[in-house]
Amino acid sequence: MTLDKNDAKLFYELWFPLLDYANKKYKVNTNLENITGAQKLEPSEVKIVADHVWEHISVIDEYLSDYDLPDEYRSIVLSWKKCISGQFVLERHLKKGSVFISADTQEVYMVNGIITSWEEMFFYRPLPILLKATLIPFRDKIISDGLVITCNVCFGKGYSSEFKDIYMNAKKNKSIHFSL
């Protein structure tokens, strides 16, 4: 499951200017000059700036006070302050999205891809997969900021079974997060 084409486009139209703002104001990564207009971006370089935004969430307020965005767009960007960064176990793929389990809290999230589904991105890897990611709201869905790192960890049957149980309990208790 992914965002529809228009929402995916809108995400990047909102996300890249925020990154540019943070990078220019705080000189986070001098290797990047113009994220919004770049033809090609190195994800590891962009991640440096994104991590700065997530670690200094007040940058979002500063950005919104300096730029006059339409209310709808302002609301979307403001919602990103509800981000959740950390390690997640990608446990399974479903029609509604992919199941992410927080390694810290064992909370279960249904996460959508932006342009490409998680299943397509990780078709070559057996599940479960340990990821470092930042989950953010986008309208009524959960997505990542698009800058995910895979951890080189293989889980045995015991852990895989435990992750399955966490998911099944969350499903039974209706405690899966579909939005933030």
Question: Across the structure, where does each feature detected by a protein language model lie?
Answer:
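A structured, charge-rich N-terminal accessory region that forms the first stable segment of a protein
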Residues: 1-71
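OB-fold/S1-family RNA-binding modules
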Residues: 22-29, 33, 166-179
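Short linear interaction motifs
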Residues: 66-84, 109-115
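Structural detector for short beta-strands of small beta-barrel domains
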Residues: 78-96
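OB-fold (S1/OB) nucleic-acid-binding surfaces
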Residues: 91-114
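Short nucleic-acid-contacting surface segments enriched for D/E, G, S/T with interspersed K/R
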Residues: 115-134
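OB-fold/S1-family single-stranded nucleic acid-binding modules
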Residues: 134-177
